[in-house]
């Protein structure tokens, strides 16, 4: 069932009786973690915010990647559930093999958290992940896991998380696409260079494809829905599907620099990514998404059918003006 909210959202409400939960949110000072916390509080649930560095609103300062089992059990004691809103972003590029870094950032902390959560009796969990696992599931012929270490790490994260949690601790995997919106001191990482570009008067170019998109608030709502349901499902989050050209055009308009977006020929897109892959190879850098295979992503329509279509314009404007 659903209920109409005064803020204009139609929020899902599970049919079973909802009790007041106490939820620990790891990465709660980040963009998505902030909106998960806001939604939990809006619905009357108790929260504990965990982050690596102290700042306003952080209840516990802890690095879960380095915490002991005893520390994690103490952190989780008395909570009904846990949300992991941290991890290594797909855009991070460093020298050396990326696989171990992705495992240490995306897999190991989730396993440690869920092992502790199971021990102390938590009954629900959610992991904020990536919509690339959705596409690997529905389009195995694309070979995303074989081509991209980041996708492999997210698949491993989901699999081992559920194995660790066991049958009495359902784990929802929140599959997050391109996100718009802001939080105090936070914007989407991908948006920084793009917003700088659209704020200039430089010509705008885009491939022919596009992507599912959502607001940070939409991620918060989907995550809390999953927690209230004690869901163990894979949950792709989408409010609107945008072509790249439309996304750039709307961002430019929101930034006060409206202008046309030209379509890049597919051959040019492929050549650019091949060149980028060679440069990374020469410099010894390995990204989470293999650059020479990115053309297949940017030239496709990475669309997801939205269960409740909604414009992301408000969040898009926030992003462009941040």
Locate predicted features:
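N-terminal Rossmann NAD(P)H-binding glycine-rich loop of SDR-like oxidoreductase domains
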Residues: 23-43
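NAD(P)H-binding glycine-rich loop region in Rossmannoid oxidoreductase-like domains
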Residues: 55-58, 62-108
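N-terminal Rossmann-fold cofactor-binding loop
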Residues: 49-54
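Substrate-binding strand-loop-helix patch
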Residues: 210-217, 235-254, 267-271, 310
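Amphipathic terminal alpha-helices
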Residues: 296-322
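Oxidoreductase cofactor-interface core, primarily capturing Rossmann-like NAD(P)-dependent enzymes
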Residues: 138-238
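Terminal hydrophobic/aromatic helix or amphipathic segment near a protein terminus
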Residues: 244, 248-298
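Conserved Rossmann-fold NAD(P)-dependent oxidoreductase catalytic core, especially the SDR/UDP-sugar
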Residues: 108-152
């Amino acid at each position: 069932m659903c209920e109409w909210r005064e803020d204009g959202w139609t929020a899902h409400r599970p049919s079973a009786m909802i009790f007041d939960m106490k939820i620990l949110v790891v990465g709660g000072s980040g963009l998505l973690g902030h909106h998960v916390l806001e939604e939990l509080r809006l619905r009357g649930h108790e929260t504990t915010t965990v982050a690596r560095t102290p700042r306003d609103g952080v209840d516990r300062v802890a690095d879960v990647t380095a915490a002991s089992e005893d520390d994690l059990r103490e952190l989780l004691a008395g909570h009904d559930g846990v949300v992991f809103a941290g991890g290594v972003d797909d855009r991070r590029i460093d020298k050396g093999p990326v696989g171990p870094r992705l495992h240490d950032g995306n897999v190991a902390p989730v396993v440690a958290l869920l092992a502790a959560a199971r021990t102390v009796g938590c009954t629900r969990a959610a992991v904020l992940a990536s919509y690339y696992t959705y596409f690997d599931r529905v389009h195995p012929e694309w070979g995303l896991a074989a081509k991209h270490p980041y996708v492999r790490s997210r698949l491993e994260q989901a699999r081992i998380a559920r194995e660790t949690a066991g049958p009495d601790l359902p784990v929802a995997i929140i599959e997050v696409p391109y996100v718009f919106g802001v939080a105090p001191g936070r914007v989407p990482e991908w948006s920084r260079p793009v917003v700088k570009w659209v704020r200039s008067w430089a010509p705008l170019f885009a491939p022919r494809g596009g992507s599912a998109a959502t607001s940070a608030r939409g991620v918060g709502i989907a995550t809390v829905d999953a927690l209230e349901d004690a869901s163990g499902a894979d949950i792709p989050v989408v409010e609107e599907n945008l072509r790249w050209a439309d996304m750039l055009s709307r961002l430019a308009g929101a930034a006060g620099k409206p202008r046309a977006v030209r379509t890049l020929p597919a051959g040019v897109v492929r050549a650019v990514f091949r060149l980028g892959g060679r440069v990374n190879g020469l410099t010894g850098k390995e990204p989470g998404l293999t650059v020479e295979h990115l053309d297949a992503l940017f030239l496709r329509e990475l669309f997801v059918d939205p269960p409740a279509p909604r414009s992301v314009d408000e969040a898009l404007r926030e992003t462009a003006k941040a």
